[in-house]
Curated annotation (Swiss-Prot):
It is found in: Plastid, Chloroplast. Disulfide bonds: none annotated. It comes from the Eukaryota. InterPro entries: Ribosomal_bL20, RIBOSOMAL_L20_CS, Ribosomal_protein_bL20_C. Belongs to the bacterial ribosomal protein bL20 family. It comes from Populus alba. The keyword Chloroplast applies. Gene3D superfamilies: 6.10.160.10, Ribosomal protein L20. GO terms for molecular function: rRNA binding; structural constituent of ribosome. The gene is rpl20. This is Large ribosomal subunit protein bL20c.
Amino acid sequence: MTRIRRGYIARRRRTKIRLFTSSFRGAHSRLTRTIIQQRIKALFSAYRDRDRHKRNFRCLWVTRINAAIRENAVSYSYSTLINNLYKRQLLLNRKILAQLAILNRNCLYLISNDMIK
Protein backbone atom coordinates (compact mmCIF):
# COMPACT_ATOMS: atom_id res chain seq x y z
CA MET A 1 0.00 0.00 0.00
CA THR A 2 1.15 3.48 -0.72
CA ARG A 3 1.46 6.09 1.98
CA ILE A 4 -1.36 8.62 2.18
CA ARG A 5 -0.40 12.14 3.13
CA ARG A 6 -2.41 13.72 5.93
CA GLY A 7 -4.59 16.75 5.35
CA TYR A 8 -3.86 20.26 6.49
CA ILE A 9 -6.76 20.79 8.91
CA ALA A 10 -5.11 19.41 12.06
CA ARG A 11 -1.92 21.32 11.29
CA ARG A 12 -3.89 24.52 10.78
CA ARG A 13 -5.68 24.03 14.11
CA ARG A 14 -2.40 23.43 15.93
CA THR A 15 -0.75 26.47 14.34
CA LYS A 16 -3.66 28.63 15.47
CA ILE A 17 -3.21 27.40 19.04
CA ARG A 18 0.57 27.84 18.73
CA LEU A 19 0.08 31.49 17.76
CA PHE A 20 -2.01 32.01 20.90
CA THR A 21 0.70 30.57 23.15
CA SER A 22 3.72 31.95 21.29
CA SER A 23 4.62 34.29 24.14
CA PHE A 24 4.55 31.57 26.81
CA ARG A 25 7.82 30.32 28.31
CA GLY A 26 9.56 27.01 27.69
CA ALA A 27 7.61 23.93 26.67
CA HIS A 28 4.36 25.85 27.14
CA SER A 29 4.93 27.39 23.72
CA ARG A 30 6.53 24.40 21.96
CA LEU A 31 4.89 21.07 22.80
CA THR A 32 1.42 20.56 21.37
CA ARG A 33 -0.15 18.80 24.35
CA THR A 34 1.26 21.30 26.79
CA ILE A 35 0.20 24.17 24.54
CA ILE A 36 -3.41 22.96 24.54
CA GLN A 37 -3.44 22.64 28.34
CA GLN A 38 -1.88 26.07 28.84
CA ARG A 39 -4.36 27.67 26.44
CA ILE A 40 -7.28 26.24 28.42
CA LYS A 41 -5.68 27.39 31.67
CA ALA A 42 -5.00 30.90 30.33
CA LEU A 43 -8.54 31.38 29.02
CA PHE A 44 -10.03 30.09 32.27
CA SER A 45 -7.83 32.44 34.32
CA ALA A 46 -8.80 35.39 32.14
CA TYR A 47 -12.50 34.58 32.57
CA ARG A 48 -12.17 34.14 36.35
CA ASP A 49 -10.02 37.21 36.87
CA ARG A 50 -12.36 39.56 35.01
CA ASP A 51 -14.80 39.26 37.93
CA ARG A 52 -11.98 39.27 40.47
CA HIS A 53 -10.68 42.52 38.96
CA LYS A 54 -14.04 44.22 39.50
CA ARG A 55 -14.21 42.87 43.06
CA ASN A 56 -10.71 44.10 43.91
CA PHE A 57 -11.36 47.58 42.61
CA ARG A 58 -14.62 47.90 44.53
CA CYS A 59 -12.76 46.84 47.68
CA LEU A 60 -10.05 49.43 46.99
CA TRP A 61 -12.64 52.18 46.49
CA VAL A 62 -14.38 51.30 49.76
CA THR A 63 -11.06 51.37 51.63
CA ARG A 64 -10.10 54.76 50.18
CA ILE A 65 -13.48 56.31 51.00
CA ASN A 66 -13.44 54.91 54.53
CA ALA A 67 -9.91 56.21 55.20
CA ALA A 68 -10.77 59.69 53.92
CA ILE A 69 -14.04 59.88 55.85
CA ARG A 70 -12.50 58.76 59.15
CA GLU A 71 -9.86 61.49 58.84
CA ASN A 72 -12.58 64.12 58.75
CA ALA A 73 -14.93 63.01 61.52
CA VAL A 74 -14.12 60.71 64.41
CA SER A 75 -17.41 58.86 64.76
CA TYR A 76 -18.24 58.82 61.06
CA SER A 77 -17.57 55.80 58.87
CA TYR A 78 -18.03 54.52 55.34
CA SER A 79 -21.22 52.61 56.11
CA THR A 80 -22.97 55.62 57.62
CA LEU A 81 -21.91 57.80 54.69
CA ILE A 82 -23.32 55.33 52.14
CA ASN A 83 -26.49 54.93 54.20
CA ASN A 84 -26.99 58.70 54.30
CA LEU A 85 -26.31 58.98 50.57
CA TYR A 86 -29.05 56.44 49.89
CA LYS A 87 -31.45 58.23 52.24
CA ARG A 88 -30.85 61.55 50.47
CA GLN A 89 -31.04 59.80 47.07
CA LEU A 90 -27.69 61.17 45.89
CA LEU A 91 -26.40 59.25 42.90
CA LEU A 92 -22.68 59.06 43.67
CA ASN A 93 -21.13 55.68 43.14
CA ARG A 94 -18.10 54.32 44.98
CA LYS A 95 -15.72 54.97 42.11
CA ILE A 96 -16.59 58.68 42.01
CA LEU A 97 -16.37 58.97 45.80
CA ALA A 98 -12.94 57.29 45.80
CA GLN A 99 -11.70 59.69 43.12
CA LEU A 100 -12.97 62.59 45.22
CA ALA A 101 -11.15 61.15 48.24
CA ILE A 102 -7.86 61.20 46.33
CA LEU A 103 -8.08 64.22 44.05
CA ASN A 104 -10.43 66.63 45.82
CA ARG A 105 -10.74 65.72 49.48
CA ASN A 106 -12.37 69.03 50.44
CA CYS A 107 -15.30 68.28 48.14
CA LEU A 108 -15.75 64.89 49.82
CA TYR A 109 -15.65 66.59 53.22
CA LEU A 110 -18.35 69.03 52.09
CA ILE A 111 -20.56 66.12 51.01
CA SER A 112 -19.99 64.17 54.23
CA ASN A 113 -20.52 67.23 56.46
CA ASP A 114 -23.75 67.95 54.61
CA MET A 115 -24.84 64.37 55.29
CA ILE A 116 -24.13 64.70 59.03
CA LYS A 117 -26.38 67.77 59.42
